[in-house]
Amino acid sequence: QQNFIGVDIKGARIWKGAKTALVQQLDNAAFLRTRIEQIELFFTPEEVDEIWITFPDPFLKKGKANRRLSSANFLDRYRKILKKGGLLHLKTDDPTLYNFTLETLWAYPQAEILYMDSDIYSRPLPNPALQFNTYYEDMHLRKGKTIKYVQFRLN
């Protein structure tokens, strides 16, 4: 059985996820309300199998790129807690964040891009887990936005 841990600083999102897990009687879901900058305090080295980054704040203002969850400083954090060969996934509607992520990964020596797509719904989904949409994903799709996806590993 896979376990899932939702991490967010916003209490309302944690509450909604926890309420859904209770209603659906999910015994493999847990939630952690914390700043992502502190993620290493909650997981031991090589404890995590996969990380999903779904529709994060793209931090588009000048000087905020280092706060993007796909910036090199976050990749360093993820690399510490991921198991060898662990996967990372990014889903976004934002082209700036998507392109920034690709550029960051190409420049990050330990990164290996396994799959990238600037419009995942224009062809059959490469990963069954992609069929589960977040609230924000559904909202962006209703507005006609394309959803971008990157799957990668940090060796």
Regions found by a protein language model. Name each.
Residues 68-87:
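A short glycine-rich, Lys/Arg-flanked "PGG" loop and its adjoining helix->strand segment in the class I
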Residues 48-69:
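A short SAM/SAH-binding and catalytic strip from SAM-dependent methyltransferases
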Residues 3-8:
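Conserved SAM-binding motif I beta-strand of class I
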Residues 16-50:
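S-adenosyl-L-methionine
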Residues 12-16, 98:
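Short alpha-helix immediately C-terminal to the canonical SAM-binding loop
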Residues 56, 84, 91-95:
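Short strand-turn motif at the edge of the Rossmann-like AdoMet-binding core
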Residues 63-64, 89-108:
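Conserved class I S-adenosyl-L-methionine
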Residues 103-155:
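Class I S-adenosyl-L-methionine
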